[in-house]
Amino acid sequence: VPATDRRPIRDRARTRRAVLDAAERVVTRHGANVSLAAIAREAGVTKSGLMHHFPSREDLFAALVEQVITRFWEEVNAHVDPGDDRPGAFTRGYVRALTGDSAYLAELNSATGLLAQLGIDSMEHVLAVDPEDPARWNRAFEADGLPPGRVWAVRYAAEGLAIGIGTAYVTDEQLRLARAELLALTETAPE
């Protein structure tokens, strides 16, 4: 095989993704103070290989937060029914994703999930990595066709439920009832 046809076993993008996925798993299991060596081991790369892609811990964590931002958006949009052109379709997808239909978001928002492990300043991390993130979400909700007060109430109630899932504070029955009520609020005609 000519040298120009050879491809590395792992290309740059795949290695970067493997490191970020490993960082998500390891930080979720062991907390934000986990060593870079532990993340590298989980990713199947050397620590110097990790450092090649992420020269500092801060660079790695910024990229990790960026991946979470992207994945959160993708998960919500995956739960928006493409055939639903009624007002509230995006908000319904958001409620479904945050209240149990997305295994990724359930783990992310759990009491021991990645957001909890990153600490109370995780929103500051989000803003530092992607200052446009809040505006992107706000635009999506504002364009959804529901009255503003209703869309914000449903959104923030869904976020509260998401944080309580899997704890003694939100039983399965309470989740079922609250989710049904939130979805019903997105079905009613705009006032």
Residue ranges and their predicted role:
Residues 22-29, 75-78, 157-164:
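Solvent-exposed, amphipathic alpha-helical segments
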